[in-house]
């Protein structure tokens, strides 16, 4: 409710781009509704109008650690492939609503955190009776699939859209020269960078 003051101060400092995130739950409170919540969309309409007044370009994150709780409880978050369709519907609403208003999009915040912070990043609660790695990599696959669909849909709606995602960068180094440490480092780096590889190459 203080965003107008914040944006005015932001403009006073001379910034030209503001990264902000749209709350999935504001647009689809449960996540599986047929129609979006108009009041939620109106809130962001007003935010973007305020940014335009100050000639500030919005850089919008579609999903930033913020999933409708119902989707987590009912479907297990991105462990379920059904989440891809829920995300597609949500992203499509945003791309259509803000065509010509938002030109820069991030599909997911720190997409590779799916393997590190599964509940926060993918709405996944690990089932102790199932293989943990399998659950994590299934969720990662579904998130990458959802992201790819968003890029496709976003460009179909507005070919001028620039769409990517946020990656939690970092490099692992071996503790010693021992082969086990070196191999562990390779594995850790692979787990992080394969998220970029898939999106750049289009395959695993």
Regions found by a protein language model. Give the residues of each.
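Non-catalytic scaffold segments within catalytic domains of secreted glycoside hydrolases
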Residues: 1-2, 7, 11-16, 28-204
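Short, histidine-centered active-site or binding-site loop motifs used for metal coordination
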Residues: 24-26
């Amino acid at each position: 409710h203080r965003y107008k003051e914040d944006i005015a101060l932001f403009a006073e400092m001379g910034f030209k781009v503001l990264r902000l995130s749209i709350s999935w739950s504001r647009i689809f409170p449960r996540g599986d509704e047929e129609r979006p919540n108009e009041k939620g969309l109106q809130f962001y309409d007003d935010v973007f109008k305020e940014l335009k007044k100050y000639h500030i370009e919005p850089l919008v994150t579609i999903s930033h650690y913020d999933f409708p709780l119902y989707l987590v409880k009912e479907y297990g978050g991105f462990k379920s492939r059904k989440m891809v369709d829920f995300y597609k519907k949500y992203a499509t609403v945003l791309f259509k609503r803000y065509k010509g208003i938002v030109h820069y999009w991030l599909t997911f915040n720190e997409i590779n955190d799916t393997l590190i912070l599964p509940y926060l990043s993918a709405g996944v609660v690990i089932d102790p009776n199932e293989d943990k790695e399998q659950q994590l990599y299934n969720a990662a696959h579904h998130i990458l699939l959802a992201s790819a669909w968003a890029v496709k849909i976003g460009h179909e709606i507005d070919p001028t859209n620039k769409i990517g995602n946020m990656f939690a960068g970092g490099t692992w180094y071996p503790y010693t020269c021992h082969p086990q440490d070196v191999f562990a480092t390779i594995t850790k780096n692979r787990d992080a960078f394969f998220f970029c590889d898939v999106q750049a190459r289009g395959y695993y």
